[in-house]
Amino acid sequence: MSNPNPNIKGRIHSFESFALVDGPGVRCAVFLYGCALRCKFCHNPDTWCPSSISQTKEMTARELFDKAIRYKPYWKNNGGITVSGGEPLVQLDFVTEFFRLMKKEGVHTCVDTAGQPFRRDPEWLDRFNELMSLTDLFMLDLKQFDSKLHVELTGKDNANILDMARYLSDNGKEMWIRHVLVPGVTDDENDLRKMSDFKIGRAHV
């Protein structure tokens, strides 16, 4: 386990204090900058990267915690905090420190990710495992199952994304697999069947 560093800084795009579709219950949703995917239907393309340094809002993990924890009374027993983006795993260490503070307060934590940064080299995986230990729920967005279709849609292969789903399942983490169904874009019947078969084979989904 790494030494706690609540002063680590993250690049924050926006903050939603009363989110109802970003995990179970009432939640605070934090949207971070940074994403390598270029999804044709992206809902938040402005989170890919700031167009100028002046648009980047930096906060320490402690500052973000202090801002979010004020809303804890609204979360009750089934709400909590969700970190989304962009792609939160781009700022993995920052999310880890933010969640470390949240877990000390007994807050339910969720990462909303497309999984693209996932890899199994030992250094990165050690850092990811630490985040995983502090995360109650992963919401994994599968854009397409077929690799060729995924490249056409996002500009990137999905081998590491599917590998992340397997890794989370093998480690017993709670995971929601989500898919955006866009008519004529992500509704290929064969691809949906493959995705369904993949989900059925994954425990804790």
Question: Can you say where each PLM-predicted feature lies in the sequence?
Answer:
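A structural motif detector for beta-strand N-caps
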Residues: 39, 203-205
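Conserved AdoMet/S-adenosylmethionine-binding subsite of the radical SAM
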Residues: 65, 69-73, 77-80, 85, ...
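N-terminal [4Fe-4S]-dependent radical SAM core
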Residues: 1-58, 70-77
